[in-house]
């Protein structure tokens, strides 16, 4: 068992350095997350802890160890030793249950034009065809699908909103490429560019029962385990988001609202929403590079009924181009670069 970074063998009462195990009782590895990288050009490399990183129970001073020490060093009858052990394990299990409750998390990622290679009868995708202007081949498509899935897996949150996918076939390919056990929701919108939303979620954490979509927006409502009933509103337009928030508040006052995507047209304080990424924006961070500065194209707003734990831009070195100054775009104008996309994801933890 680990206490303050040291393994303690409760059988022989020996201390072992990190990374070692006793062989009789202790079988564990110490997980140590690597230091967060920092991207050049003004965007802080901000990461987040995965769900398992919050499961870090500290056993220092726990009665469990006192019971074992007392039992080994005194002439206590075996029955009392057994009772003491059982009590210790019960206290240990109760402590772990309390400490293991992770905060809830939501993320949003603009995949930056993830088209398939088949002509669409609904939208104008002629540029993104093998014979089109972008020379969008099957190999390039598969590479971007794998990169998008890697971003979702790296975020590792129960709710990950995705924008910029052409159809459900693309979403299905991304879900199949994900290593995490994600389910997905998809609805076709009436956008002129043929790009839609999808929601990737953990089926044991979120239980959706209502999905709606319209012109540059999509909502998914349901029970978020441990948080009650919530609704995630995703937006790809600053123009309509304020109206959609007010409409939702009128029609579903019992639902706690999460907003992700383009939110510049919203009035968060008037609508009972907090801005977890406000500090990051003031610090000059953003999701997309525009000339010599960063723009917060994607954002997250959280219902004030929740307490924000942390929110920021999600930046990793492999999401940046070789210069480290901007996100690694798939295309620069018409030149193929081979990156995941020109946008960085955003995320927020809340309780």
Predicted regions and their residues:
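Intrinsic-disorder-associated, low-complexity terminal segments enriched in Asp/Asn/His/Tyr and depleted
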Residues: 1, 12-15, 24, 29, ...
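Bacterial Sec-dependent N-terminal signal peptides
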Residues: 12, 53, 66-102
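Compositionally biased, low-complexity flexible segments
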Residues: 23, 27-50
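N-terminal, active-site-proximal structural segment of metallo-dependent hydrolase catalytic domains
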Residues: 67, 98-177, 189
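Active-site beta-strand/loop signature of hydrolases that rely on acidic residues for catalysis
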Residues: 106-111, 147-171, 232-236, 241-270, ...
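Structured beta-strand-rich core segments of catalytic domains in phosphoester-bond hydrolases
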Residues: 165-228, 235
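Metal-dependent phosphoester-hydrolase catalytic domains
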Residues: 247-258, 264-351
């Amino acid at each position: 068992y680990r206490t303050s970074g040291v393994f303690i063998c409760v059988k022989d009462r020996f201390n072992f350095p990190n990374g070692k195990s006793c062989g009789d009782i202790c079988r564990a590895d110490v997980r140590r997350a690597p230091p967060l990288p920092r991207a050049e050009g003004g965007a802080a490399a901000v990461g987040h802890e995965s769900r398992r990183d919050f499961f870090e129970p500290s056993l220092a001073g726990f009665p469990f160890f006192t019971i074992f020490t007392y039992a080994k060093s005194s002439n206590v009858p075996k029955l009392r030793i057994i009772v003491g052990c059982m009590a210790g394990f019960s206290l240990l299990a109760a402590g772990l249950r309390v400490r293991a409750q992770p905060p809830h998390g939501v993320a949003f990622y603009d995949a930056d034009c993830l088209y398939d290679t088949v002509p669409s009868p609904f939208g104008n995708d002629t540029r993104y065809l093998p014979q089109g202007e972008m020379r969008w081949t099957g190999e390039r498509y598969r590479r971007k699908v794998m990169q998008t899935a890697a971003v979702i897996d790296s975020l590792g949150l129960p709710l990950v909103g995705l924008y910029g996918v052409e159809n459900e076939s693309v979403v299905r390919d991304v879900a199949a490429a994900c290593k995490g056990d994600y389910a997905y929701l998809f609805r076709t919108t009436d956008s002129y560019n043929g790009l839609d939303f999808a929601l990737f979620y953990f089926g044991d954490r979120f239980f959706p029962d209502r999905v709606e979509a319209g012109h540059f927006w999509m909502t998914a409502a349901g029970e978020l385990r441990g948080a009650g009933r919530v609704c995630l509103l995703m937006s790809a337009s600053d123009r309509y988001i304020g109206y959609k928030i007010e409409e939702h508040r009128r029609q579903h006052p019992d639902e706690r609202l999460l907003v992700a995507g383009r939110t510049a047209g919203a009035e968060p304080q008037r609508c009972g929403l907090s801005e977890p990424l406000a500090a990051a924006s003031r610090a000059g961070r953003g999701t997309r590079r525009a000339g010599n500065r960063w723009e917060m194209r994607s954002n997250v707003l959280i219902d004030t009924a929740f307490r924000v734990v942390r929110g920021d831009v999600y930046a990793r070195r492999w999401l940046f181009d070789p210069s480290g100054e901007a996100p690694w775009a798939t295309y620069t104008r018409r030149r193929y670069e081979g990156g995941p996309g020109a946008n960085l994801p955003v995320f927020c933890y809340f309780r």
